[in-house]
Amino acid sequence: MSSMTRKLSIVTTLYRSMDTIDEFIQRALAAGEAVSDDIEIVIVDDGSPDASANIVRNWVERDARISLLRLSRNFGHHKAMLVGLEHAQGDLIFLIDSDLEEPPELLSEMAQVLRGKAVDCLYGLQERRKGSRMERISGHLFYWLFSALSEVGIPQNVSTMRLMTRRYVSALLKFRDKNPVFVPLSILVGYPQASFPFIKASTSDTTYSLGRRIALTALAITTFSAKPLILMLCFSLMMAFLGIVYGGFVVVRALIGPVQDGWASLMAVVVFFFSLNAVFTGLMGLYVKQILEEVKDRPRSIIQDIYSKRNSSET
């Protein structure tokens, strides 16, 4: 099947995208038409509080190639992306954000590279990280922590933008994590993958606050690694050994001669270990929370409305 006859799906999400979505659709359509004569654009509204969805609905009325999936609330970027992939019907699927920081025009070159390298996933890799100093520092810290504590290695400055084959996406969707972290999951899929270096523009402020970045880091580590638990066990065993040694030393000192008071140092040690115990308990609580979310088996997201020129329904 030639590249111009293979069905192409372009998948994106909406969240406060009112300023960019109209231009994005225009550019995405043009980019898609250069790659395939059979395209669709699947847009997922992740509970956006602005008028982004209304703009897309106007496009749906004019172009049958565009469909809009409205989630019942904000479920999060990673879940919204997976909803879009679940509804994409193409032989090739191009996942990209709608904020125009990743140019849709990269699609044509990525399609050529995908065919040339014979891979199933070609993921974007930022040549240099955009954003403020704090964003860059927090980004580097995330990759450092994740690489140090996880069994899943992810490239630094990897983007969610990627061009994928149908079999790759079908395999990715077999993962049913209730709190998915997209990039590590995409690595776990396997299949031949390659990077596509690009420069990400900085057109708007990030919607990922520091708090959301910290939460995502904690979720990624506790979802994909048991190393923190192993480190806790090793540290506890080491402290227990040192405690036994120190206890023996105290007993010997007491038998040999008088013991001087040392309440200040004793309290410092007690407070330190109580604090350490609180940290360990909190970390274990995160793991228990992840287990609880999985066993409850709640839906990962809920689609409220599906809009297309052929279908307009509420679910």
Name every feature range the model reports, one short phrase each.
Residues 16-19, 101, 105, 173, ...:
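Residues in soluble alpha-helical coiled-coils and helical-bundle/repeat scaffolds
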Residues 10, 41, 65, 77, ...:
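Residue-level recognition of specific faces of alpha-helices
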Residues 69-73, 77-87, 104-180, 201-211, ...:
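Acceptor/aglycone-binding surface of glycosyltransferases and processive sugar-polymer synthases
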Residues 1-132:
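Structured catalytic core of nucleotide-sugar glycosyltransferases
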Residues 59, 87, 113, 148, ...:
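Conserved catalytic core of Hanks-type protein kinase domains
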Residues 55, 171-172, 196:
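Residues that scaffold the ATP/ADP-binding catalytic core of kinase and kinase-like folds
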Residues 2-5, 181-315:
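Hydrophobic helical membrane-anchoring modules
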